[in-house]
Amino acid sequence: MSARGPAIGIDLGTTYSCVGVFQHGKVEIIANDQGNRTTPSYVAFTDTERLIGDAAKNQVAMNPTNTIFDAKRLIGRKFEDATVQSDMKHWPFRVVSEGGKPKVQVEYKGEIKTFFPEEISSMVLTKMKEIAEAYLGGKVQSAVITVPAYFNDSQRQATKDAGTITGLNVLRIINEPTAAAIAYGLDKKGCAGGEKNVLIFDLGGGTFDVSILTIEDGIFEVKSTAGDTHLGGEDFDNRMVSHLAEEFKRKHKKDIAPNKRAVRRLRTACERAKRTLSSSTQASIEIDSLYEGVDFYTSITRARFEELNADLFRVTLEPVEKALRDAKLDKGQIQEIVLVGGSTRIPKIQKLLQDFFNGKELNKSINPDEAVAYGAAVQAAILIGDKSENVQDLLLLDVTPLSLGIETAGGVMTPLIKRNTTIPTKQTQTFTTYSDNQSSVLVQVYEGERAMTKDNNLLGKFDLTGIPPAPRGVPQIEVTFDIDANGILNVTAADKSTGKENKITITNDKGRLSKDDIDRMVQEAERYKSEDEANRDRVAAKNAVESYTYNIKQTVEDEKLRGKISDQDKNKILDKCQEVINWLDRNQMAEKDEYEHKQKELERVCNPIISKLYQGGPGGGGGSGSSGGPTIEEVD
């Protein structure tokens, strides 16, 4: 373990997140305060507080417009992005545009607030960091965070920014399937030598990734990635929700669609039923007073669930075929198939995949929800220099998910780095001018697989000026693409004759947060955190005075004290207790020191009487009883 303390691995998921740490030679997946090993990627804002994780998800039915989830679908994207526009139709919360970037709008403590997706993700990361710190009993500073293989540069950078806002040193951003492969590589360390082709099938709550890797002598190489950024467990839930909403309409002639709360309660029940159907062939759904006082009791069979999702289940095989084509492999050449993501527990999906690979056994040895965090934790240990023999021989090669290149004459895409190239990588190519005496060139950087740049995604552009006048085709302009281990791209253009150069780090043009933005968000995150803590302290003080009051009340009303305490003293205490109880009812939102003051007031009345009662006890003031009889203590 490094002197800086352990580094953690965080699987920042679309719907759920998970955190692990590598220590004592093995990975521990860390449970949260609710005992769950995965935590919902949800943040909720109320009139009084901010909630993250289970607490946020549990109250979503009551507070749908101020409960944010799916931040991963917004991060690193433009507001105008077609996927953002289509996703917005399905979200109960508002998304607004600020300078072309999406922000979520909520009401928090009675005020309208807006947050960038990076800020919401940083709140989820803060929760994961706190879960780890509670388990490890100390501060955590460094982490490896995972992203889908599909994430482009700006999405990776924005995820890294979210980690920075949290106050984490992000050691590296790695692909989720690569992380799962690391977990798998450790689990299967003892296999026979030789190269091994592994297919990773990752079907989570919100994204679907298929990756093919080769593993040889502890070296992982990603051969291909494919998938669908918009397929997962939630889509299966939606099918069930629509089906049951129709059933409700048929039975009760009522349409629940306009009622957000009813739909949300139905969705929660569907999610539970779906999980049940992975182990049972039937699940019952019982929702009291779903809509306009009508109860909804029904059941759904596994067969019906499979039928509702038949097309979605089948479509999961297309990326498998594409990944095989890209890796230039036949399905018979895949030695191992690894399941990742909660949705791979669905028996029908396992069967389709197994049949596709002619009955080959699937690897389910790793808990599918935890495999990614597991691998990230191992990678974090390697990066901070863990010398454990379990991780020593591991080397990690990642790839670019899309080809990267520049636009040349006529709008043609000229790739410098082909997709699925192992990173880090550096490629240089020489270009020239298109017209005589051209004094500047515009370098436009694109990612994508299409022949024309108009069909690809513009990452950024810059001008190289000051080229000496010359006939077309004479100047030599050297363009270099350099991708680091995090998949972040630097593009440089240099005029060979003058040595003049210009460069761009591909982030700015795509709405990357500025350093000032990040600093501001770090401060805000600190402020929200201290507000949350202040609220916790306030509630603790309220609970303390409440339980103290009721304890005292109970003590003096106890039959055993009959005759030991005068009626006058007894009434004095009971009157004061009642006064405090009435005050508490009226002041649910008082400040911490007001509650503490009330408790001291009550102690001043009670302590002298109580210590008189148990002779030999200390005189008033401290709130502690003596050794005889029941002790009454201040509640911390």
Curated annotation (Swiss-Prot):
Gene3D superfamilies: 1.20.1270.10, 3.30.30.30, 3.30.420.40, Actin, Chain A, domain 4, Substrate Binding Domain Of DNAk, Chain A, domain 1. Residues 613-636 are annotated as: Disordered. Residues 616-628 have a biased composition (Gly residues). Keywords: ATP-binding, Chaperone, Cytoplasm, Cytoskeleton, Differentiation, Methylation, Nucleotide-binding, Phosphoprotein, Spermatogenesis, Stress response. The modification N6,N6,N6-trimethyllysine is found at residue 564. SUPFAM superfamilies: Actin-like ATPase domain, Heat shock protein 70kD (HSP70), C-terminal subdomain, Heat shock protein 70kD (HSP70), peptide-binding domain. GO terms for molecular function: ATP binding; ATP-dependent protein folding chaperone. It is found in: Cytoplasm, Cytoskeleton, Spindle. Residues 2-389 are annotated as: Nucleotide-binding domain (NBD). Transmembrane segments: none annotated. The modification Phosphothreonine is found at residues 408, 414. Interacts with FKBP6. Interacts with ZNF541. Component of the CatSper complex. Interacts with RABL2/RABL2A; binds preferentially to GTP-bound RABL2. Interacts with SHCBP1L; this interaction may promote the recruitment of HSPA2 to the spindle. Interacts with MOV10L1. Molecular chaperone implicated in a wide variety of cellular processes, including protection of the proteome from stress, folding and transport of newly synthesized polypeptides, activation of proteolysis of misfolded proteins and the formation and dissociation of protein complexes. Plays a pivotal role in the protein quality control system, ensuring the correct folding of proteins, the re-folding of misfolded proteins and controlling the targeting of proteins for subsequent degradation. This is achieved through cycles of ATP binding, ATP hydrolysis and ADP release, mediated by co-chaperones. The N-terminal nucleotide binding domain (NBD) (also known as the ATPase domain) is responsible for binding and hydrolyzing ATP. The C-terminal substrate-binding domain (SBD) (also known as peptide-binding domain) binds to the client/substrate proteins. The two domains are allosterically coupled so that, when ATP is bound to the NBD, the SBD binds relatively weakly to clients. When ADP is bound in the NBD, a conformational change enhances the affinity of the SBD for client proteins. This is Heat shock-related 70 kDa protein 2. It comes from Capra hircus (Goat).
